[in-house]
Amino acid sequence: MKLERVSSNGSFKRGRDIQSLESPCTRPLKKMSPSPSFTSLKMEKPFKDIVRKYGGHLHQSSYNPGSSKVELVRPDLSLKTDQSFLQSSVQTTPNKKSCNEYLSTPEATPLKNTATENAWATSRVVSASSLSIVTPTEIKNILVDEFSELKLGQPLTAQHQRSHAVFEIPEIVENIIKMIVSLESANIPKERPCLRRNPQSYEHSLLMYKDEERAKKAWSAAQQLRDPPLVGHKEKKQGALFSCMMVNRLWLNVTRPFLFKSLHFKSVHNFKEFLRTSQETTQVMRPSHFILHKLHQVTQPDIERLSRMECQNLKWLEFYVCPRITPPLSWFDNLHKLEKLIIPGNKNIDDNFLLRLSQSIPNLKHLVLRACDNVSDSGVVCIALNCPKLKTFNIGRHRRGNLITSVSLVALGKYTQVETVGFAGCDVDDAGIWEFARLNGKNVERLSLNSCRLLTDYSLPILFALNSFPNLAVLEIRNLDKITDVRHFVKYNLWKKSLDAPILIEACERITKLIDQEENRVKRINSLVALKDMTAWVNADDEIENNVD
């Protein structure tokens, strides 16, 4: 064998074996290692089928002694697609027998006999022999077979669907928000209205309802109110306006002004968070409702922190059982539209406070100062003089009733047209009731005089007999020890029933018994009178016949 060294462009190529003419034997075979260019070919047949077709090596033409040139017969390695092969299923795993199948060495590659190269080439042949053509359909079938046991659920991804075009019109969105705000007004925390007072005993309940089943139910409810069960705090969901703000940017911009129009809190934590966020924002709040419901831990400095809240549009201000706070003095100049002020159970409210406040609330219609023990006649007179539109006034109390006398009642009757009056526990006497009935009796619809210890039979019973309160619907006269004559109450009530306008008389157990006895007596008298009239009518025919005879 003869070695030739060939140089081209200044570089030496590797020696190439030239087979002599005297050597008729074929070249030795070696394992073929696929090059990157070879493996990158998109073969149209599996590599192992090519190997099997040519018997594991490249065939060479037989030696021709008359020829001076060696002719190497190259196998036909054209990569044509076999249609029958594409239609059949593809064998993805290599055949183990193909590990020992070899290809002949190309011409330009020298013989390699080292053990390391042989081991490397063997592994490469295995990988190369596994090359095959896989169509997308076959890949899908293979994946389906391999993953058939897996059960995948639907992905929990939010589907962003475009809303209807009508919900992108600002005017329509604003009308929707207004409707939601009107519905949300029912969730404003407020004192539950009491249809009837709780009975003082089971016998009292029987006298009130005159039905055993209803009496038991009312008495059971009264007992539960006295000893309420311990109920765990339940965190409520966000309101409807919060959900509207999360729809999109348009709904957010439309909802935000409505969010600050009605501010009501019954959780100290929520109110503290509101104070914190209100100081971080630059937006000015102009609410029409501001209500705090039973926030015992809120103090006056907390209220003073509401520097960005303006009260020009405020119509309803309520601090229900918030004993430590009062409306700041800085609010007084902007309360001209205030119509409803409810501050019960607050010892910080006194005459000086009412004197300064009354000058800024000319449109006030409802004022509740129940259990504000430091208010006297002076403060009530200031309210009566400066609030002519007043319709509801309640200053009932359990302590220090001597501070409120008939002076306050007469002032309200003279300067206002109040319809609901609450003077429970105050020192109102007969003269004050007479004067009030003369001045404003025709406008009164509800009158509460519970525990007014100075009232006697010379005031209310006679006023009812004279129909001094023609539009009265509810009368509360509990714990009036000096009231013993209830005849006019019963007659007035029966007369109202005949007009389909009955009056509700809320009385204590003693007065209720007197009223019940008087009603039975009146019914007996009416029955006797009716029987007497019927007897006279029946006997009238006999007398006529006797006179004719």
Curated annotation (Swiss-Prot):
One of its GO terms (cellular component) is nucleus. Keywords: Cell cycle, Cell division, Cytoplasm, Mitosis, Nucleus. It comes from the Eukaryota. Gene3D superfamilies: Ribonuclease Inhibitor. The keyword Cell division applies. GO terms for molecular function: small GTPase binding. InterPro entries: Leu-rich_rpt_Cys-con_subtyp, LRR_dom_sf. Residues 1-39 are annotated as: Disordered. Negative regulator of the mitotic exit network (MEN), required for multiple cell cycle checkpoints. Acts in the daughter cell to inhibit the mitotic exit pathway once MEN has executed its function. Through its binding ability to TEM1, interferes with the TEM1-CDC5 association, required for CDC5 kinase activation and MEN activation. Required for daughter cell separation and chromosome stability. Involved in copper sensitivity. Interacts with TEM1. Belongs to the AMN1 family. This is Antagonist of mitotic exit network protein 1. The gene is AMN1.
